[in-house]
């Protein structure tokens, strides 16, 4: 027996620990290994470098609205492959795959509820659903959100995270840009606030329509915001773009957005702004969550 075999006989192999999949994750920015549950408690913000990772639509709405107040709207609306569109894959197959992966029927989730006791309607994009692209159902759900805000005489908040219009729906997708913008004009006529929160990324037809039409346009840190992407622009102008081009910090320097707010501070900041705009008491984070009295819907003047 060789000396190597004698050493091997005295070694007792340890039992390999089984770690369930999804317990740990890695920060996309700094590479820090993070405990998944802790990251979720921190609203998907890296505790080391403050990188704001992408957040699901439902988690975002649940983190915003008061617990027990959420009521979903427009969930019965489902996308249809009217054009029988096919690129490298059938559109209906892409829809089925996205629905299975995300558990959502389409890329926008709309809920009404309360924010520190104040009635609001909120919408959030699910970027994992075909890149948060805007099709007819996204447009219809957004209009439904506007109509609900008008009915309840309350503010509307939308969290955008989209690559733009959904090419598989062609002109029906592009039509949603005008449809959603026209709906927001009714909010303006009524004098109800609409706050647009731009998250990473907000691009294309969404940025060219309702995402930039807020009475206040707020962005998360380092969010990519624009129409065409930086690579497309560089290839078109054949020049190297400035560092941080199209990021929220660049845009606020140019006056394209109103403010940048970190995700953990977003809830209180939105509530404080809306309370001022609606002439309601300022939210108190320490006080128990109670409903507030919202001014009644103003009488409509008869049309001439």
From Swiss-Prot:
Residues 23-292 form the CoA carboxyltransferase N-terminal domain. Pathway: Lipid metabolism; malonyl-CoA biosynthesis; malonyl-CoA from acetyl-CoA: step 1/1. GO terms for molecular function: acetyl-CoA carboxylase activity; ATP binding; carboxyl- or carbamoyltransferase activity; zinc ion binding. Its EC number is 2.1.3.15. The keyword ATP-binding applies. Residues 284-304 are annotated as: Disordered. Binds 1 zinc ion per subunit. One of its GO terms (cellular component) is acetate CoA-transferase complex. Its main location: cytoplasm. Zn(2+) binds at residues 27, 30, 46, 49. GO terms for biological process: fatty acid biosynthetic process; malonyl-CoA biosynthetic process. Keywords: ATP-binding, Cytoplasm, Fatty acid biosynthesis, Fatty acid metabolism, Lipid biosynthesis, Lipid metabolism, Metal-binding, Nucleotide-binding, Transferase, Zinc, Zinc-finger. PROSITE patterns: COA_CT_NTER (PS50980). It is found in: Cytoplasm. Residues 295-304 have a biased composition (Pro residues). InterPro entries: AcCoA_carboxyl_beta, Acetyl_CoA_COase_Trfase_b_su, ClpP/crotonase-like_dom_sf, COA_CT_N, Znf-ACC. It catalyses: N(6)-carboxybiotinyl-L-lysyl-[protein] + acetyl-CoA = N(6)-biotinyl-L-lysyl-[protein] + malonyl-CoA. It comes from the Bacteria. Its cofactor is Zn(2+). The keyword Cytoplasm applies. Belongs to the AccD/PCCB family. Acetyl-CoA carboxylase is a heterohexamer composed of biotin carboxyl carrier protein (AccB), biotin carboxylase (AccC) and two subunits each of ACCase subunit alpha (AccA) and ACCase subunit beta (AccD). Component of the acetyl coenzyme A carboxylase (ACC) complex. Biotin carboxylase (BC) catalyzes the carboxylation of biotin on its carrier protein (BCCP) and then the CO(2) group is transferred by the transcarboxylase to acetyl-CoA to form malonyl-CoA. This is Acetyl-coenzyme A carboxylase carboxyl transferase subunit beta. It comes from Shigella boydii serotype 4 (strain Sb227). The lineage of its organism: Bacteria, Pseudomonadati, Pseudomonadota, Gammaproteobacteria, Enterobacterales.
